[in-house]
Amino acid sequence: MSWSPSLPTQTCGAWEMKERLGTGGFGNVIRWHNQVTGEQIAIKQCRQELSPKNRDRWCLEIQIMRRLNHPNVVAARDVPEGMQNLAPNDLPLLAMEYCQGGDLRRYLNQFENCCGLREGAILTLLSDIASALRYLHENRIIHRDLKPENIVLQQGEKRLIHKIIDLGYAKELDQGSLCTSFVGTLQYLAPELLEQQKYTVTVDYWSFGTLAFECITGFRPFLPNWQPVQWHSKVRQKSEVDIVVSEDLNGTVKFSSSSPFPNNLNSVLAERLEKWLQLMLTWQPRQRGVDPQYGPNGCFRALDDILNLKLVHILNMVTGTIHTYPVMEDESLQSLKTRIREDTGILETDQELLQEAGLVLLPDKPATQCISDSKTNEGLTLDMDLVFLFDNSKMSYETQITPRPQPESVSCVLQEPKRNLSFFQMRKVWGQVWHSIQTLKEDCNRLQQGQRAAMMNLLRNNSCLSKMKNAMASTAQQLKAKLDFFKTSIQIDLEKYREQTEFGITSDKLLLAWREMEQAVEQCGRENDVKVLVERMMALQTDIVDLQRSPMGRKQGGTLDDLEEQARELYRRLREKPRDQRTEGDSQDMVRLLLQAIQSFEKKVRVIYSQLSKTVVCKQKALELLPKVEEVVRLMNEDEKTVVRLQEKRQKELWNLLKIACSKVRGPVSGSPDSMNVSRLSHPGHLMSQPSSACDSLPDSDKKSEELVAEAHALCSRLESALQDTVKQQDRSFTTLDWSWLQMEDEERCGLEQACD
């Protein structure tokens, strides 16, 4: 179908005639719009000069259309009331759903598709058309005129939907499943139809294969510019596996069984579809569509296997090569890494697989964790979902990236840019040159994506490091506070100890224990370790900020974008030349742009890899710091426990000493200030009678504390003398003091003595 200007306004009730959508096999197709409901339909009407045979075909098309119901076959609609009266003849009108996306030919003719559709668009197209053909064949219908003009596009909820139209040449199979008449489009015609031989559904296989090849490469597979007679005599010489018969710039005809370059398919799909095209483009009808695994007509099942592949795309940042792997639903990441090692030589332990956001692929999840559905993006995205492979054994990355090899025709004009080419040769070569510049730009963007993924991963590690730094600082502050408290406390204790020595109370063991504690806490704190780590982290932070500020740390446009746009403009001007100006010419301007693009690519790659090496160095520093910070935090936590333990031990020793002293005082005073007097304190033997039992009851396990307590008992006599002097001086004021702390019952006294023990 081809698009035409608007027609003179004509109405039928609420329906208004709009533009002509195109011309089909028997007549015109016109868009009508309902001004009340907003509904749109396509009305196909026959030309008046149809022969009786074609009038019968037209009626057959309407019958076929009205009984078909499939999402990839355009649906028939009811002809609005009264519209049949507007028909130019007595033949019935055919009303169909309107697909606003236009036909596939219009889509293929867009400049961007000169070297084939994007991968996602190809997969979507193959899926839809295969489904439609299956349906038609199951309903015993051969289309016979499958071509881009007879496929229209409709925007669905998630993607573009392709629908087959124009069944004007469709033929219902008779009981023998053979047909002998045909009038169709020669360029997509199966050989047996050209030869007017009997045929089956395999004629649609040939047309489908030709259509698929054109969508993949941007041109038809077999000498597209040759006349039918010469075409037939030359192409029939191809082998059963040849899928390309082309003419080079020297006029030499070449046969090939390989998919031509360039195209937009990944390596796995290119290989699988190459095998599938060999099935579809077999010259002999009986062998066409026969799959080795699924047998006759097994080409659709073979295509299903291809369309259902789950592919992981790995960009090796060491070489710049993309490796594509079909993976099973439950395949482990370790299994994928083993396959990567076989292709790249990078050990599994050294492989780091990053997604674009810098996230590491999780080892406990399957290899499919990074796959999205490429058939839902309508083929509009320029990039596949990439996983970036880094070699952790490398501390720096060398620039090992070179531009991809050029197609043969492009290499030819690079060597001879002044060589004159025909218009059709120039159109193909210039399109390939433009595509080569596009490819350079996309390859550069992918490498930069990999560098940014490494940068994002560095920032994630740096974020973890910053959190650990904050935790280290918090732990250091807490430890310092406890150390300061402990040191201050022990200094006070030592000062008070020196003051009380005037009363004659001394303990070398107690003093030695306190001195040992004081020395022990001096080993705690880790202030120097913390300081060194903080300095290293601050230096790393400065390096990371410098990386982020670098222009290459962000997505850049630049020279390649400009050169690609200039090449596109040159190609557009060539394509839009009037027919009378389509003369021979050279390719100097396009070659100049390609050479500049190659130089710009190599320069950008050097900058990207310089940035990547700096990123890798920073990441290595961050990874080295992480365990060191963890270790210092662990040691500080141990130091904190040590300080707390020493503090508790010192306090227990003080309280043990105090309890023993108090027990010697409480015994003679019997807990009553009224009965306390000097005479009660004048019997050293009585005062010394209780501590021995307390000492005997001390646990054997705490030997050091027992020794200190024993020494304290030895000092009791000195303490009694001091207490007697104090009691004598304040005997008169005892009754005014608060002695409630001595009001204890015998059970409490026993409990305290047991606690002391």
UniProtKB/Swiss-Prot annotation:
Binding-site residues, ATP: 21-29, 44
Domain (Protein kinase) ranges: 15-300
EC main group: transferase
Crosslinked positions (Glycyl lysine isopeptide (Lys-Gly) (interchain with G-Cter in ubiquitin)): 163
Residues recorded with modification Hydroxyproline: 191
Region (NEMO-binding): 737-742
Gene Ontology biological process: B cell homeostasis; canonical NF-kappaB signal transduction; cellular response to tumor necrosis factor; integrin-mediated signaling pathway; interleukin-1-mediated signaling pathway; negative regulation of bicellular tight junction assembly; negative regulation of cytokine production involved in inflammatory response; neuron projection development
Catalytic activity: L-seryl-[I-kappa-B protein] + ATP = O-phospho-L-seryl-[I-kappa-B protein] + ADP + H(+); L-seryl-[protein] + ATP = O-phospho-L-seryl-[protein] + ADP + H(+); L-threonyl-[protein] + ATP = O-phospho-L-threonyl-[protein] + ADP + H(+)
One GO MF term attached to the UniProt entry: scaffold protein binding
Localization of this protein: Cytoplasm; Nucleus; Membrane raft
One Gene Ontology CC term in the entry: membrane raft
Annotated domain remarks: The kinase domain is located in the N-terminal region. The leucine zipper is important to allow homo- and hetero-dimerization. At the C-terminal region is located the region responsible for the interaction with NEMO/IKBKG.
The name this protein goes by in its record: Inhibitor of nuclear factor kappa-B kinase subunit beta
